UniProtKB/Swiss-Prot annotation:
Transmembrane segments: none annotated. This is FK506-binding protein-like. The keyword Repeat applies. It comes from Rattus norvegicus (Rat). The keyword NADP does not apply. Forms a ternary complex with CDKN1A/p21 and HSP90AB1/Hsp90. PROSITE patterns: TPR, TPR_REGION. GO terms for cellular component: extracellular region.
């Protein structure tokens, strides 16, 4: 009976736990223009139902058409002159996000030592996000770790910026390599929250389930970028649990690989599949997706090996057959090109 590589399904995790913790931080982030969806990429539905937190993905640098004007006026607004738009960034006032997704230019330094954490309700003045981005404009309340605002194009970047700010801080957000600010934020106040390490294991798993559930909803709605963020946040929560960790990590890595393929990141997709296959060597969807990724990377031998493993277990699997056919054709084209090159060398 054919095992569908397309429709979400429940899975039993039978693999033995791995003793080493994998370093997947880089692999939890990816976002580029969305490509046409291919068969065999839909994520599995979680057996338990629901999942949440933080894959983000590193956002692609975009051209900002409408630069943000400086804030003026009373204490409820930014105190920035328009001349500041052209000033060179001073190294002493810069904060670089560790994942490289943005640079924060501090305009007014905040006070105190505390910063927003998971669950903190932040009173924020946000101005200048690109039109249609879905991000709030003006005074708003944003809760770290929850809310649909985090699923917007600039949501996760904004959340990471807020987590780096102190009360009263005003800052401009710059994308890497851009001197024009994407937006400006002022953190007026925030409530106490908790770091992820302060959460009990059951709390982390509950948050991860909600994030997973939301990620699958977004994927089915045609938003692999938003889905990847959700899956990445769920994985980051679960990776803080003692090894081997819950079996749901296998499904999350497989789902993340599906998103990464659609987003044009075959190298990251292959790495996500590796994490799955370390725990469950016979995971058909991971084998298929890694085969697709290897083909995209030009490693036709590895692609062929993975796809043949799928067909050995499920000979009627149409998606694997079609992909293997493409790989064979691609190999013949490469061989023909090599032969022409050799003839020219010895002619």
């Amino acid at each position: 009976m054919e095992t569908s590589l397309i429709s979400p399904m429940k899975e039993n995790n039978t693999a033995q736990p791995q003793q080493r913790e994998e370093n997947t931080q880089q692999n939890l982030n990816a976002a580029v223009p969305i490509k046409q969806q291919s068969p065999g990429l839909l994520p599995e539905a979680l057996e338990v139902g629901v999942k949440p937190d933080p894959a983000s993905q590193i956002l692609a640098t975009q051209e900002i058409e409408n630069p943000v004007a400086g804030f003026e006026g009373d204490s409820d607004k930014f105190h920035i002159s328009t001349d500041e738009m052209a000033e060179h960034l001073q190294a002493s006032d810069l904060w670089y996000c560790p994942d490289g997704s943005f640079v924060k230019k501090i305009i007014v330094h905040g006070h105190g030592l505390d910063k927003p954490k998971l669950g903190s309700k932040c009173r924020v003045l946000a101005l200048g996000f690109p039109f249609g981005s879905g991000m709030p404009e003006g005074w708003t309340e944003l809760t770290i770790g929850t809310g649909q605002w985090r699923e917007k194009t600039w949501g996760e970047l904004t959340e990471k910026c807020l987590e780096s700010m102190r009360q009263g801080e005003e800052a401009k957000i710059h994308l890497p390599g851009s001197s024009t600010p994407l937006a400006k934020l002022r953190l007026d106040s925030f409530t106490n929250g908790r770091d992820s390490w302060e959460l009990e294991a059951v709390e982390k798993e509950a948050l991860a389930k909600e994030e997973h559930r939301r990620g699958t909803e977004l994927f089915r709605a045609g938003n692999p970028q938003g889905a990847a963020r959700c899956y990445g946040r769920a994985l980051r929560l679960l990776l803080t649990l003692p090894p081997p960790g819950p079996p749901e990590r296998t499904i999350l890595h497989a789902n993340l690989a599906a998103c990464q393929l659609l987003l044009g990141h075959p190298q990251l997709a292959a790495q996500s599949c590796d994490r799955v296959l370390e725990r469950e060597p016979g995971h058909l969807k991971a084998l298929y997706r890694r085969g697709v990724a290897q083909a995209a990377l030009g490693d036709l031998d590895k692609a062929t090996a993975d796809l043949k493993k799928v067909l050995a277990v499920d000979p009627k699997n149409r998606a694997a057959k079609e992909e293997l056919g493409k790989v064979v054709i691609q190999g013949k084209i490469q061989d023909a090109g090599l032969a022409r090159g050799l003839r020219k060398m010895f002619s």
